[in-house]
Amino acid sequence: SQPKMTENKQRLSFWQIWNMSFGFLGIQFGFALQGGFMSRIFQTLGADKDAIPLLWIAAPLTGLLIQPIVGYLSDRTWHPKFGRRKPFFFFGALLSTVALFFAPYSSALWMAAGALWILDASINISMEPFRALVADKLPDSQRSYGFVVQTLIIGIGTWVASNLPWLMTKIGVPNTAAEGIVPDSVKYAFAIGAFVLFSSILYTILTTDEYPPENVEEFEKEKAKNKGFFSGFVEIIKSISEMPTVMKQLGVVQFFSWFAFFTMWSFATPAITEHIFGATDTTSVEYNNAADSVGSYLGTYGLVSMFYALILAFVASKIKINRKF
């Protein structure tokens, strides 16, 4: 079972909630640059468009494995100085920053695919504890508000990061390069993203405290009892089997939603650059300007998603929803 944390939680101010959620800005910078421009990097390195989904496959497989493991481990972590979730924030941010910075410098497809794999794994290490932090820190009456603040930060991060290559081009950074070389506009965008990712997560680490377990001695006993790989594996399987019905229903919805997400992220750049802009030469001005535009379109999608999420959160808080199926 999951060790209990302190239940007497104080109501937090807007800025306290903002501080604890601010790291999501960097996480979303990483996800937006990954989702909007990794296919562009793959194509620049010579990938055929039909092979792009295979190059992407590491990302969802990594998330499938990393998320339950990180969730299990972070639930059973406590250090008087470093807290419960913050060690995962830090190490995930460190690895993500390195992978994000070096991804556009890949000289071969296997290097770019490896960078994507490391980037996705590292972002998941930071992201999952961030979601759990809302439940850790906020009383029940403020949890919805906490997720709304996270949604706001996610939308801002998606829009800004997705427009970075376009902005770099506008201020004069070269947007084309020789065959097999990623343009400087993309390299600069990923470097800025790496800086924002690490600094925003570090800001949350430095400005946010965590509640200790209700009973530290009991917490340590529980952790010792479930020590080891096999115990952890059994606990994860047990948690999945005992998942509430509503979560299982949500899982089905998410399962089908990700068909669309994965198709969009992997194929948006090759499809739009070729069929809308008529550009297939990755060294041409036309292709790279079109690829910048694809990123901007995905940024707009993120911004619109944010507004709809805020509207739905408001509606859900005002209207009693019948959840019978």
Task: Give the residues covered by each predicted segment.
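Intracellular loop-helix junctions on the cytosolic face of multi-pass helical membrane proteins
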Residues: S1-W15, S107-G114, I123-S126, F130, ...
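Helix-loop boundary and gating motifs at the non-cytosolic
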Residues: T6-T62, K248-V253, S257-T282
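Loop-to-transmembrane helix entry
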Residues: D48-P60, V148, D184-S185, G278-L303
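MFS transmembrane alpha-helix packing/gate-lining sites
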Residues: T62-I66, I153, G157, T300-Y308
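Helix-to-loop junctions at the C-terminal end of transmembrane segments
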Residues: L65-F82, F307-I321
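Primarily marks hydrophobic transmembrane alpha-helices of the MFS/SLC 12-helix fold
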Residues: G83-F89, F325
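C-terminal ends and interior cores of transmembrane alpha-helices
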Residues: P87-A108
